[in-house]
């Protein structure tokens, strides 16, 4: 397994090993005993039938360094504290009303994206970088408020974290060898990032508290409530089993920023990649978008709710290219028998969502991009159908699905409405390199560069 850790094709390698050794496969990763799940049948056992037994997270050097007292939602151990953090996230931060409230941010940032593309017509455009800038802006403004120097600094730190996530810390594989903790090249990089995060976060909290004291509404760098304001309000009013601390707020904000930026940008670049590679689908989805939005020069989220084929295109993209190709690892907290094998306590659980989404035993012509397949398959983002788990499933599934999907749908609709797209240098669709690179998310190995030609001008 160690030779796979340094490759760009770890998802492929694990899938190939599973074809030889079975859908539940044991791996010895240094001192860490791990099992890899590569089928929906076994995933159902660990994510549904025995979900609580596999609800913990393994302790990693990175989380110990980056988090304050290991307080957050994503990597905290399962229990009363985790349940409170989950409630905070789903009820206060990512409920339907809050996602809708941030619609104006998404619409403004999509407008900026469209304008930036209009200024570069007929020239190769690095869409990967444009998508990253867009999702960074949407998530940061929703989280901390107005555009500012702090936002720019924060985006850079989040990008640094994402780049480090592509590697691994050998001390995580040999936790008993203390010398490795000292010699690890990852540790000083993480410590540098932590210092930057502390400085940025403390300034963000200070600014928010000062502005809350100055405004009658009690919040707002811009007079509107962002997610930091929400958490400060929750902290002030209390009423939870555990008092909401500044460390909790730090952890949740970090979860939001990491979870809401790279994943959405990755989904956008893969969707556009698949559309360029599949002209039939591109023509069909553009026809739907342009018919539904015909005559409009200013477009809002409400205008795109009926774009059913666009939604199928996004679903199919996430089947083939789940941003978290290997779901965040879990830890067995209670010994269980899975698929006839006894799984001991403290075994690390790895779920290959990429392999499950391409399983030819369930998906017809599994490697082909066919959005229409979802007309006949009951599969949504809620994790009920274990053959389709781009956001995970069970207690630990992603709580930010609505926010993430909203951040993908609108820019796609507008880019397809306003522009025609082609590959540069006369390249044919089938020649587009679709190689992947494994990191914080499963991104394209090479940036997606396309040429846009104006079709329907936007309202300046």
Swiss-Prot record:
Heme binds at residue 398. Keywords: Heme, Iron, Metal-binding, Monooxygenase, Oxidoreductase. Its EC number is 1.14.-.-. The keyword Heme applies. Its cofactor is heme. InterPro entries: CYP450_71D, Cyt_P450, Cyt_P450_CS, Cyt_P450_E_grp-I, Cyt_P450_sf. One of its GO terms (molecular function) is monooxygenase activity. Pfam families: p450 (PF00067). Probable heme-thiolate monooxygenase. Belongs to the cytochrome P450 family. PANTHER family: CYTOCHROME P450 71D8, OS08G0105600 PROTEIN. This is Cytochrome P450 CYP71D312. It comes from Panax ginseng.
């Amino acid at each position: 397994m160690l030779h796979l850790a340094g490759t760009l094709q770890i998802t492929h390698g694990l899938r190939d090993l599973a074809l030889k050794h079975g859908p539940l496969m044991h791996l010895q990763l240094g001192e860490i005993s791990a099992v890899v799940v590569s089928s929906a049948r076994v995933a159902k056992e660990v994510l549904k039938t025995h979900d609580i037994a596999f609800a913990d997270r393994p302790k990693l050097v990175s989380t110990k360094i980056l988090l304050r007292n290991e307080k957050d939602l994503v990597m905290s151990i399962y229990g009363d504290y985790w349940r409170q953090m989950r409630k905070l996230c789903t009820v206060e931060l990512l409920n339907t009303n809050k996602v809708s409230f941030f619609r104006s941010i998404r619409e403004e940032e999509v407008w900026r994206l469209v304008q930036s593309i209009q200024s570069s017509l007929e020239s190769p455009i690095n869409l990967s970088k444009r998508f990253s800038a867009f999702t960074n802006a949407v998530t940061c403004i929703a989280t901390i408020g107005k555009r500012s120097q702090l936002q720019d600094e924060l985006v850079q730190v989040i990008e640094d974290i994402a780049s480090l996530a592509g590697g691994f810390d050998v001390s995580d594989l040999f936790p008993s060898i203390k010398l490795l903790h000292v010699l690890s090249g990852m540790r000083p990089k993480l410590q540098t990032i932590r210092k930057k995060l502390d400085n940025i976060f403390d300034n963000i909290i200070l600014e928010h508290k000062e502005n809350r004291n100055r405004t009658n509404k009690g919040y707002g760098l811009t007079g509107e409530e962002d997610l930091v304001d929400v958490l400060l309000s929750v902290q002030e009013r209390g009423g939870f089993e555990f008092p909401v601390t500044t460390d909790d707020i730090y952890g949740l904000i970090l979860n939001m920023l990491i979870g809401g930026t790279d994943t959405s940008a990755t989904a956008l670049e893969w969707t556009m990649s698949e559309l360029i590679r599949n002209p039939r689908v591109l023509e069909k989805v553009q026809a739907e978008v342009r018919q539904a939005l015909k005559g409009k020069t200013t477009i809002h989220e409400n205008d795109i709710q009926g774009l059913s084929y666009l939604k199928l295109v996004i679903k199919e993209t996430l089947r083939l290219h789940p941003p978290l190709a290997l779901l965040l690892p879990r830890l067995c907290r209670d010994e269980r028998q899975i698929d006839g094998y006894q799984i001991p306590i403290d075994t690390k659980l790895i779920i290959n969502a990429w392999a499950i989404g391409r399983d030819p035993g369930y998906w017809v012509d599994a490697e082909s991009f066919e959005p229409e397949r979802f007309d006949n398959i009951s599969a949504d983002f809620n994790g009920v159908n274990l053959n389709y788990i781009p956001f995970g499933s069970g207690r630990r599934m992603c709580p930010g699905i609505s926010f993430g999907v909203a951040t993908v749908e609108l820019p796609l609709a507008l880019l397809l409405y306003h522009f025609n797209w082609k590959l540069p240098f006369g390249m044919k669709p089938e020649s587009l390199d679709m190689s992947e690179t494994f990191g914080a998310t499963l991104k394209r190995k090479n940036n997606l560069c396309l040429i846009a030609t104006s079709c329907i001008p936007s309202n300046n």
